[in-house]
Amino acid sequence: MRLCDRDIEAWLDEGRLSITPRPPVERINGVTVDVRLGNKFRTFSGHTAAYIDLSGPKDEVSAALDRVMSDEIVLAEGEAFYLHPGELALAVTFESVTLPADLVGWLDGRSSLARLGLMVHVTAHRIDPGWSGHIVLEFFNAGKLPLALRPGMMIGALSFEPLTGPADRPYNRRQDAKYRDQQGAVASRIDKD
């Protein structure tokens, strides 16, 4: 059962859930908290690798990822990031989120943006219990026109679901937590699997 707006506010007030900066009450509705787009992005360099063998030797996977991922792009205030049709890019939420060991989060895109072809997550929309950091968005433009994305715009909504009890291995305590405390648009670390 997901937390309703009243319970989200209570969890925030009690410090059981942290969203920084704390969203105003106007952005907490029904079962969701609206989140905004941050100013950090990464793109994929075109045709710098013939392919990436995801199950190949880790050093080869790592080298291929280094070839295809751009350095982090940090936009200045007022700048826009242009996502062209058929392109995939990474970005982050403006807000940082910290979940306790007994709560899982879910990121959903906005219907108004989806109707223009923008997907804010390709498959990874679960936020594990114990997570702390900015949420990476996996943008894909399935539309016909380039989309201008500006830091600060409403980009998605988070919902939260209590677990039956605290997880024994929450994300922030796992030794293999590849994205712990991420602050930017961190590229895939599949080579760390």
UniProtKB/Swiss-Prot annotation:
Q: What's one GO BP annotation on this UniProt entry?
A: nucleobase-containing small molecule interconversion
Annotated GO molecular function terms are: dCTP deaminase activity; nucleotide binding
| Residue ranges with Basic and acidic residues bias | 170-181
Q: Where does dCTP bind?
A: 110-115, 128, 136-138, 171, 178, 182
Swiss-Prot/TrEMBL catalytic activity:
dCTP + H2O + H(+) = dUTP + NH4(+)
Q: What does this protein do?
A: Catalyzes the deamination of dCTP to dUTP.
Q: How does it assemble?
A: Homotrimer.
By sequence similarity, the record places it as follows: Belongs to the dCTP deaminase family.
Q: What is this protein called?
A: dCTP deaminase
Q: Which organism is it from?
A: Enterobacter sp. (strain 638)
Gene symbol here is: dcd
